[in-house]
């Protein structure tokens, strides 16, 4: 486990507490994982009697296997490689991603995904606003800006890779599409682990949380996923809605906005500490801030970072005992 150095001013007491918490975390991590954290030129233990394959991040020098990058040693059968930390997003087909539209082009939107290439969302690869499955027409192409414009935040799924290395996205489900009434956060992609569920609804708080595999995380007011038939039935009503009604619909209650900010700051703290970002850890951090009556803006201070590190060490120790 590679911990980050906290870039915040700490008092002498806070520094001692923080270092003690990090030592506990590192001891728990090293005893729980067989994977070894390495830096450049570290020796990687291998059995030379058995054949092994040198993978990415390794090099053999004088019969010894050395790491050429910082990261965690991974072994797949005979292959030995080093998984780098703090690297850019490495996409896989089926990944749930959150991104920001940077260009509206011919029959497509280009989306920034924290990857070395932009994602491409084709007009034909998403549900139309009317919810009807049909061929896309020239009228649909002319109305593309009514769906997404530059700087819109969207959620989609990685469909495949194009010949130029860019990602082809798809948003054919009602759970994908434009994200509104919330905030977008960015963490290092290695802090997000792929799982079966990346869409979360925190019912007690009325908040939607989308943890993108690319390190972009969306925190927003809960939005019900509407059935396509319901969308079609409400189409006429939406067409006659007034601008004042639209303003009312865009209003977010103060309590909801405060909750979004609290969850957002919890994610920022976890990112600063280099902790894996999961729903469980996020909500525990939020509950910790509430139990200690810490204001939203104070969550980004040094003291709360130390408290979170101590709490995470205790959580992992308790979890290991079970």
UniProtKB/Swiss-Prot annotation:
**Molecular function in Gene Ontology:** RNA binding
GO biological-process terms attached to the record:
maturation of 5.8S rRNA; negative regulation of post-transcriptional gene silencing
The reply to whether Oxidoreductase figures as a keyword in the UniProt entry is: no
Identify the stretch annotated as signal peptide in this record: none
Taxonomically, the superkingdom here is Eukaryota
What's the family?
Belongs to the RRP4 family.
Domain remarks in the Swiss-Prot or TrEMBL record: The two RNA-binding domains (S1 motif and KH domain) are separated by a conserved linker of five amino acids (KYGKL) and can bind RNA independently. Both domains are also needed for RNA degradation and interaction with RRP41, another exosome subunit.
Protein's recorded name:
Exosome complex component RRP4 homolog
Species of origin reads Arabidopsis thaliana (Mouse-ear cress)
The organism that produces this protein has a lineage beginning with: Eukaryota, Viridiplantae, Streptophyta, Embryophyta, Tracheophyta
């Amino acid at each position: 486990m590679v911990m980050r150095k906290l870039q915040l001013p700490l008092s002498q007491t806070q520094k001692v507490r923080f270092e003690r918490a990090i030592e506990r975390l590192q001891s728990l991590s090293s005893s729980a994982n067989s994977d070894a954290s390495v830096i450049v030129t570290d020796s990687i233990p291998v059995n030379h009697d058995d054949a092994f394959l040198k993978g990415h991040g390794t090099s053999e020098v004088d019969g010894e296997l050395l790491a050429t990058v910082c990261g965690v040693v991974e072994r797949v059968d005979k292959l030995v490689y080093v998984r780098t930390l703090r690297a850019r997003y490495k996409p896989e087909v089926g990944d749930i991603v959150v991104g920001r539209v940077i260009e509206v082009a011919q029959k497509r939107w280009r989306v920034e995904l924290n990857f070395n290439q932009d994602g491409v969302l084709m007009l034909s690869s998403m549900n139309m606003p009317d919810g009807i499955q049909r061929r896309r027409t020239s009228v649909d192409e002319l109305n593309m800006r009514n769906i997404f414009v530059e700087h819109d935040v969207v959620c989609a799924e990685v469909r495949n890779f194009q010949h130029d290395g860019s990602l082809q996205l798809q948003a054919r489900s009602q759970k994908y599409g434009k994200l509104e009434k919330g905030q977008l956060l960015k963490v290092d992609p290695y802090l997000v682990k792929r799982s079966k569920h990346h869409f979360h609804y925190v019912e007690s708080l009325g908040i939607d949380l989308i943890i993108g595999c690319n390190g972009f995380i969306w925190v927003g007011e809960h939005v019900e996923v509407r059935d396509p038939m319901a969308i079609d039935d409400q189409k006429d009503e939406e067409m006659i809605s007034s601008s004042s009604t639209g303003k009312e619909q865009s209003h977010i209650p103060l309590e909801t906005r405060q909750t979004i900010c609290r969850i957002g700051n919890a994610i920022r703290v976890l990112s600063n500490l280099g902790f894996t970002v999961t729903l469980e850890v996020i909500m525990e951090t939020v509950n910790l801030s509430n139990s200690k009556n810490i204001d939203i803006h104070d969550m980004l201070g040094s003291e709360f970072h130390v408290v979170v590190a101590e709490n995470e060490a205790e959580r992992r120790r308790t979890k290991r005992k079970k």
